[in-house]
């Protein structure tokens, strides 16, 4: 046997196997997605997302307190308005009495050490279920005013106390619009801008759309989310968002797009890189484990470690509560 053929001596021991990883999973890498509804007492199971719930603001202390004591560092909030009147411009998105702003304010008071990100989009709040304004009398997105409206919502969340605003709408120009408003308001140095830069038009969003009530009333979102086979377009979107002032770059979904995540690491070596293990990915892992195909913990680790290997420094994951326990084991 050639000397260069011998590899196993370098990973025969569990500790030596850990050393083979450039980076290992830590609790601080995980950001937990939380669905916030406008019923302050809500605690409602989400059938399509096993183990996840819609929460009212008055339930957050009892829910998140134990997780924070286990080491939870960050959450990202998604509004689920059930009682508001939706309109063409998504007016409830930045309602001071809406679920996201109330949750930001409450969490800042309850848990000063918790990092709070807020997803910024209009689809949960518009009467048509799309992520921006429509040209009058048409079903075509009006990009420029959509980007400005998204920026207004982001600014409202920043003013409420969000540490991070994360626009997921995929409107052209929204990163620059948000950054400009944060600068003009004197908040650009106090609020992180995390861009869903490479967000693909994926079939893996179904459980989330049920959870958030964000299914479009007509058509789909393929005109503004990226085509799944468009690697070059994703690279251009990442470059654009860096130039427009994004502080963190995100790839979504995660597992089918690890090549894009690796591209992002090459394009933006100085930026933190996030990926979102989306609802469909989570549901598949849970379903496979329930069917006896594999053990849940094993597959949760394998998928998450593949994301870190590809370059992720931050993982948005519904498995976050489990990892708080698993990483202590």
Describe every region a protein language model picked out.
Residues 1-21:
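N-terminal amphipathic/basic leader segments beginning at the initiator methionine
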Residues 13, 21-22, 26-31, 37-329:
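Alpha/beta enzyme core
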């Amino acid at each position: 046997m050639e000397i260069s053929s011998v590899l196993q001596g370098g990973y025969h021991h569990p500790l030596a196997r850990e050393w083979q990883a450039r980076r290992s999973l830590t609790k601080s890498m995980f950001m937990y997605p939380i669905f916030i509804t406008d019923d302050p007492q809500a605690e409602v199971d989400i059938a399509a997302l096993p183990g996840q719930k819609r929460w009212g603001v008055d339930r957050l202390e009892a829910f998140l307190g134990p997780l924070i004591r286990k080491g939870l560092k960050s959450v990202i909030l998604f509004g689920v308005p059930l009682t508001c009147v939706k309109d063409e411009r998504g007016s409830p998105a930045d309602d001071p009495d809406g679920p996201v702003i109330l949750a930001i304010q409450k969490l800042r008071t309850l848990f000063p050490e918790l990092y709070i990100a807020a997803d910024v989009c209009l689809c949960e709040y518009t009467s048509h279920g799309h992520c921006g304004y429509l040209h009058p009398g048409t079903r075509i997105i009006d990009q420029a005013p959509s980007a400005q409206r998204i920026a207004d919502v982001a600014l409202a969340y920043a003013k409420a106390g969000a540490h991070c605003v994360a626009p997921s709408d995929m409107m052209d120009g929204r990163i620059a619009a948000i950054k400009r408003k944060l600068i003009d308001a004197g908040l650009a140095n106090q609020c992180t801008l995390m861009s869903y830069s490479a967000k693909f038009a994926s079939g893996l969003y179904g459980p989330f759309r049920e959870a958030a009530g964000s299914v479009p009333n007509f058509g789909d979102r393929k005109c503004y989310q990226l085509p799944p086979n468009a690697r070059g377009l994703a690279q251009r979107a990442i470059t654009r968002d860096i130039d427009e002032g994004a502080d963190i770059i995100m790839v979504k979904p995660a597992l089918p797009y690890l090549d894009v995540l690796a591209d992002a690491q090459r394009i933006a070596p100085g930026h933190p890189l996030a990926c979102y293990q989306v609802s469909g990915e989570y549901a598949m892992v849970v379903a496979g484990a329930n069917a006896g195909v594999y053990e849940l913990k094993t597959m949760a680790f394998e998928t998450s470690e593949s994301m870190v290997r590809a370059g992720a420094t931050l993982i948005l994951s519904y498995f976050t509560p489990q990892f708080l326990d698993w990483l202590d084991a």
